[in-house]
Amino acid sequence: MPLIGKGNQAVGDLGEQTAADYLVKQGYRILERNFRSRGGEVDIVAKDRQGCIAFVEVKTRRSLAYGLPQLAVTQRKQHQISKGALAWISKNRLHECTARFDVIAVLLQDGSEPTIEHIPNAFDLAY
């Protein structure tokens, strides 16, 4: 898919779809996408083959001019994801579940297959 003329939202959406497809191929089950709560958000909530819930932040770039995508997951962003994860767990009454925070970095460049880097346990719960 050509990226020229695509806005940041469209590129981000494509990155999230690419990440979700990747997770499914790895044996994950997607439970929810783009979960929002008061002060929190999670791009993808998925369950791995061992039954662990992965709260996944997806960062997408068209080039490395501004650095690696995963470096954009700041302390503030980790806090927002943590709040979203806690809200999702509460909403779904899964207080005893095993969970972790992953980051998937997606590099989308015209004429190339997407480059995907999955970082399980990328960070701990941030209060």
UniProtKB/Swiss-Prot annotation:
Pfam families for the chain:
UPF0102
Taxonomically, the superkingdom here is Bacteria
User: What is the protein name for this chain?
Assistant: UPF0102 protein Glov_2230
A GO molecular-function descriptor: nucleic acid binding
Q: Which residues cross the membrane?
A: none
Check the record and name the InterPro entries matching this protein.
Answer: Restrct_endonuc-II-like, tRNA_endonuc-like_dom_sf, UPF0102_YraN-like
- Recorded family membership: Belongs to the UPF0102 family.
Can you name the source organism?
A: Trichlorobacter lovleyi (strain ATCC BAA-1151 / DSM 17278 / SZ)
Query: NCBIfam families of this UniProt entry?
Result: PRK12497.1-3, PRK12497.3-3, YraN family protein
